[in-house]
Amino acid sequence: MSTKNKKAAGGNGGAPKQTRQQSHDSQDYSSFKTVLFYCMLIVFLPVLTFFVLKGFVLDQFLNISEVKVNIASAVGAVVALHIALGLYIYRAYFGAPGSKGSKTD
């Protein structure tokens, strides 16, 4: 059998290559899910924090002017944004357990 026929027949070298590709695909998908989660957290957490603080917490329970309510809600949103960014940076710097990549040639 010629070399050309062995490759077409799916010789023994195809299985490790396929599992390696699946491993890379699963790592890429896991990375994508992580980045997507943190992007959504960074975008939506401050907005949600602003409106929750403004609409439910500060307006309902505290008797302060609307300008002060807006300022306090904005400060809360900025704090929430910094927390989300800090979580992302912590995860990016220290990584998830078992995420150490190994070099393969």
Curated annotation (Swiss-Prot):
Q: Which GO terms describe its cellular component?
A: endoplasmic reticulum membrane; endoplasmic reticulum-Golgi intermediate compartment membrane; ER to Golgi transport vesicle membrane
Topology versus the membrane, per the UniProt entry?
Answer: Multi-pass membrane protein
Where would one find the signal peptide in this protein?
none
Record keyword Endoplasmic reticulum present: yes
Question: Where is it mostly found?
Answer: endoplasmic reticulum
UniProt keyword terms in alphabetical order: Cytoplasmic vesicle, Endoplasmic reticulum, Membrane, Transmembrane, Transmembrane helix
Question: Which portions of the sequence form the region Disordered?
Answer: 1-26
Q: Which residues lie on this side of the membrane: Lumenal?
A: 58-68
Topology, Cytoplasmic side? 1-36, 90-105
Entries under Pfam families matching the protein: VMA21
For biological process, the GO terms are:
vacuolar proton-transporting V-type ATPase complex assembly
Subcellular location, record wording? Endoplasmic reticulum membrane; Endoplasmic reticulum-Golgi intermediate compartment membrane; Cytoplasmic vesicle, COPII-coated vesicle membrane
For this protein, the parts annotated as crossing the membrane are: 37-57, 69-89
What superkingdom does the record give? Eukaryota
**Family assignment from sequence similarity:** Belongs to the VMA21 family.
What's this chain's function?
Required for the assembly of the V0 complex of the vacuolar ATPase (V-ATPase) in the endoplasmic reticulum.
Q: Which HAMAP family match?
A: VMA21
Q: What name appears for this protein in its UniProt entry?
A: Vacuolar ATPase assembly integral membrane protein VMA21 homolog
What taxonomic lineage is listed for the species of origin? Answer: Eukaryota, Metazoa, Ecdysozoa, Arthropoda, Hexapoda
